[in-house]
C-alpha cells in the first residue's frame, strides 16, 4: 500500500470495477426489454483469498463479486441472472505487463520481489484463457447459474477450504505463500 500511488489505485478500480459497472449499466435496460439474460462478471479467487502485495487488485475483485451478488437479487424480477467467475492463475499477457510498485528503497522490497516471482510462476503455469471462456459459455446457457463459480477444480478447492478453515490459518498460509 505504501509504495502504490493513489492514482494507480484509482486506475485499477476504474478498470476492474467501474469498467464492468459501466458495461452493466449499458446492458441492463436492453436485457430488461428483451425479457432477461445473463450477466457474467470475471472476478478472481483473489476476491475471497486476498493476496499480499496485490491488495488493490484483490479489493477490486472483491467489489466486483459483491456487486454481482447484490445485482443478482435486484435484477432477478426482470429475468436477468448475474454470476461471477473467480479464476485463479490464468496464462495471459498480464504476467509480462504487471507493474511492480515497490521502490528500490522500499521496506517491502525483497518480499514484493519474491511474491511477484511466485505469482508470475503460477500464472505461467495457469489455466489457458479458453478454460475460463468455456465456464462462461456454460454459465450463459445454464437455467439457474450459481452466483459464484471457481475457475477450475483447484480453485474450487481453495475457495472451499477458505470457507471451512479459520481465517487466521488462511491468512497465515497466504502470507507464507506470497509474503
Where are these regions (language model features)?
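Substrate-binding pocket helix/loop in short-chain dehydrogenase/reductase
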Residues: 1, 8-10
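Active-site loop immediately N-terminal to the catalytic Tyr-X3-Lys motif
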Residues: 2, 49-55
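Hydrophobic positions on the long internal alpha-helix
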Residues: 23-27, 41, 67-68
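Active-site helix of classical SDR
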Residues: 24, 60-63
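Residue(s) in the substrate-gating loop at a strand-loop-helix junction
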Residues: 44
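C-terminal beta-strand-loop-alpha-helix "lid" module of Rossmann-like NAD(P)-dependent dehydrogenases
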Residues: 72-123
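C-terminal helical subdomain
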Residues: 84, 106-155
Amino acid at each position: 500500500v505504501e509504495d502504490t500511488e493513489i492514482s494507480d489505485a484509482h486506475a485499477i478500480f476504474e478498470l476492474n470495477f467501474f469498467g464492468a459497472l459501466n458495461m452493466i449499466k449499458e446492458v441492463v435496460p436492453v436485457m430488461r426489454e428483451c425479457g432477461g439474460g445473463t450477466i457474467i462478471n470475471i472476478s478472481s479467487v483473489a476476491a475471497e483469498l486476498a493476496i499480499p502485495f496485490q491488495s488493490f487488485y484483490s479489493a477490486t475483485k472483491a467489489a466486483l463479486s459483491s456487486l454481482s451478488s447484490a445485482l443478482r437479487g435486484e435484477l432477478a424480477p426482470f429475468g436477468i441472472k448475474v454470476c461471477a467467475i473467480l479464476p485463479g492463475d490464468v496464462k495471459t499477457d498480464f504476467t509480462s505487463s504487471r507493474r511492480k510498485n515497490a521502490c528500490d528503497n522500499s521496506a517491502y522490497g525483497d518480499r514484493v520481489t519474491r511474491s511477484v516471482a511466485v505469482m508470475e510462476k503460477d500464472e505461467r503455469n495457469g489455466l489457458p484463457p479458453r478454460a475460463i471462456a468455456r465456464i462462461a459459455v456454460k454459465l450463459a446457457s445454464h437455467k439457474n447459474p450459481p452466483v459464484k463459480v471457481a475457475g477450475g477444480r483447484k480453485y474450487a478447492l481453495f475457495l472451499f477450504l477458505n470457507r471451512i478453515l479459520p481465517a487466521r490459518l488462511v491468512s497465515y498460509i497466504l502470507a507464507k505463500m506470497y509474503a
